[in-house]
């Protein structure tokens, strides 16, 4: 991504954001609500509202292919890449699924959109493989269930299955653990790590929670970028950012989170 800027109605929401995600690498994008994190991720998939004004370059390179600027692609080509070369796990697993469609049909819909030549049996096998891979119990039976019959953590696994079923190279996870309790949150983060390692996925992980981002971006080469008011104010390797933060905003973010060693009488830093 090179100097991405996004404006809505003449008001700039993202300004000159640049970063790179290498194959197999995870980049955490962290910042407070309204800092431009989600707008940046939606720009990658070109899912911003029609009134958004977008400039800059977003170069994507598939294995063995020539780099392409996603912002310059015709919409037809972008539709082909969206969901196959790159996919997104959206926020709010409790509401992101269609409540009147069986979950297996929703995953199958993603397969048919990008592999239209497959017969019904082949599609079903891919759906079952994806459900197995995200550790959903009894997928042969549960693929015929509706979203309301699953817990919040299981619904998040279904959304992840929909995202990975076509084997994308880039996975965008936008606050994938926000609505989950800490135990299920840890399970989802462990699952994402397993999928990264199994498929060599690159990942853009978005959160307002530095602790969650630290868990999602804990492999060698992983980095964290801190956003404030539409700018990336600091980007560094995960350990470097936590041990030696450079920007005042990053320091305040870290200081605002309590630790086991924090004195109960000590006031936390405000951001």
Regions found by a protein language model. Name each.
Residues 165-169:
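A short, proline-enriched helix->beta-strand linker immediately N-terminal to the Walker B motif
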Residues 121-141, 254-255:
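Conserved ABC ATPase "signature" region
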Residues 67, 137-143, 235-271:
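Short catalytic/signature loops enriched in Gly
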Residues 65-87, 105, 113, 240-245:
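ABC ATPase NBD coupling module
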Residues 186-199, 211-214, 218:
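Helical segment within the ABC ATPase nucleotide-binding domain
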């Amino acid at each position: 991504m090179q100097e991405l800027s996004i404006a809505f109605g003449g008001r700039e929401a993202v300004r000159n954001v640049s970063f790179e995600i290498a194959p197999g690498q995870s980049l955490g994008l962290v910042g407070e609500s309204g800092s431009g994190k989600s707008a940046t991720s939606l720009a990658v998939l070109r899912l911003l509202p029609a009134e958004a004004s977008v400039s800059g370059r977003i170069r994507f390179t598939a294995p063995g292919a020539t780099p392409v600027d996603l912002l310059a692609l015709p919409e037809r080509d972008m539709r082909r890449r969206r969901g196959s070369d790159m996919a997104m796990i959206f926020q709010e697993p409790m509401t992101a699924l269609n409540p009147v469609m069986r979950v297996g049909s929703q995953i199958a819909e993603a397969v048919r959109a990008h592999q239209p030549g497959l017969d019904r049996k082949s599609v079903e096998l891919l759906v079952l493989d994806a459900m197995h891979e995200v550790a959903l119990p009894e997928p042969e039976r549960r693929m015929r269930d509706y979203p309301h019959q699953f817990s919040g953590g299981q619904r998040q696994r279904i959304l992840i299955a929909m995202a990975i079923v076509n084997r994308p190279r880039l996975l965008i996870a936008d606050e994938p653990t926000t609505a989950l309790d800490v135990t299920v949150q840890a399970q989802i983060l462990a699952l994402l790590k397993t999928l990264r390692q199994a498929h060599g996925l690159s990942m853009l992980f978005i959160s307002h929670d530095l602790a969650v981002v630290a868990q999602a971006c804990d492999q060698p080469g992983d980095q964290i970028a801190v956003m404030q008011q539409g700018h990336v104010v600091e980007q560094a390797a995960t350990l470097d950012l936590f041990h030696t933060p450079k920007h005042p905003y990053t320091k305040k973010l870290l200081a605002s989170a309590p630790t086991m060693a924090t004195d109960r009488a000590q006031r936390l830093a405000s951001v």
